[in-house]
Amino acid sequence: MSHVVPAGRHTVTPRIVVEDAAALVAFLKRVFDATGEFQSDAPSQIRIGDSLLMVSKAGPRETFPAFLYVYVEDAEATCERALDAGALSLEAVWETPYGDRRGMVRDPWGNVWQIATPGRR
């Protein structure tokens, strides 16, 4: 099978639709050191590490939260930043059976983020 993926993207690109897209973009920058800017007239293209996440304001589309697994350098510090930015802790950081250190938070828009530091396997 042959397909074309635009430069800088992956085959699958998650998209989150929320009421206040600008605030979610600010949250992502604060918590994950994301890059990219809020765009009011198109989906905002936000990068977390090597991945692209599209963030849209509700309107033509209804709100739709996401459940995402994100690898970071320091799961504890990233979870703490998320809590400081208004997220709710769903699971304290712990050592998973497969080796990742992972915590879980829900952001103010209902998105769930599993935040992990890779295991040493």
Regions found by a protein language model. Give the residues of each.
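Conserved active-site alpha-helix within GNAT-family acetyltransferase domains
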Residues: 22-30, 103, 112
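Short glycine/proline-centered loop/turn elements that form peptide/ligand docking sites
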Residues: 23, 38-44, 95, 121
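Vicinal oxygen chelate
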Residues: 1-7, 11-19, 44-47, 58-121
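Short, charged/polar, Gly/Pro-enriched secondary-structure boundary elements
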Residues: 51-55, 110-112
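Short beta-strand-to-loop elements that line the ligand-binding cleft
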Residues: 14-16, 37-38, 92-95
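N-terminal beta-strand motif that seeds the catalytic metal site of vicinal oxygen chelate
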Residues: 1-26, 35, 50-52, 66-68, ...
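Conserved acetyl-CoA-binding loop of GNAT-fold acetyltransferases
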Residues: 30-37, 86-88
